[in-house]
Amino acid sequence: MGRRRIDDTSHPDQSLTNEFWLRFSDNPQPPMREKIIYLTMDAVAERGPANFNSAEVCDRLGITHPMVNHYFDNRDGLLAVTAFVVYDRHIRSLWDAVAKAPADPVKRLKAWMWQQVSSTDVMGGWGAVLNYPHTSLTVTSIMNAQFRDEINELFEWNLACLAILVSDVKKGIVSPLPAQIDPELRSELGGQSDIVALVSSVAWSALGVAVWNTGQHLASAQVPEVIDQREALIEAHIDHVVNTL
């Protein structure tokens, strides 16, 4: 395969149009490194990390296979970088959903929980990497080594904002959400043991139903009544969690 011109935006896969790339960002022709990440996002979401073939991504883009090593060191490095991008987008999508919800404490919390379900569903096979790290130890080790600080920051910010949502439901108010967590906020929220317990319960509950919905639980996936009522069951579960606060 000959060397590509730097201004060559064509690819052997004709489906990789400007419109395709706009699914991922506002750039209709992102840099090649980002294109590799975006195709990896799709491939792992669809087939899971074990069946991911980085050579297929390169072939779709019309680049040589060693380009993965050039940008990411190796296949696992590519998966680690992409896993962080997926996690970052997942967390931010939760709060985009809250921002779009009506200014009502219950509706904002429900928006967060529903987005947890929806985003985890879109995440697909990435759930195995992010929720069950032992299934991809090398990938998660690289991810932790490269992005541990950023992951911790996102995790703490997500829980801090969720604590505010939960507290708002109990008080019947709507509070502004911080753009980032600082030591003062961390200390303030950490001192409210009752809220911390409720936040943990809400977060675990939302993740549980999200993983169940995405994973197509082997036993219940074959029960027609469960399939037909899936959305209603999730809605009832979310209502129950919120009503118990």
Model-derived regions, located:
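Solvent-exposed, amphipathic alpha-helical segments
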Residues: 35, 39-47, 89, 93-100, ...
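Amphipathic alpha-helical packing segments from all-alpha helical-bundle domains
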Residues: 91-96, 107, 128-132, 137-200, ...
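Helix-turn-helix
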Residues: 32-35, 39, 43-77, 81
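Hydrophobic/aromatic residues within well-ordered alpha-helical segments
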Residues: 32, 75, 82, 86, ...
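Amphipathic alpha-helical linker/stalk segments
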Residues: 20-25, 82-111
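N-terminal intrinsically disordered/low-complexity leader segments
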Residues: 1-31
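Short, structured helix-loop boundary elements
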Residues: 33-34, 54, 76, 106, ...
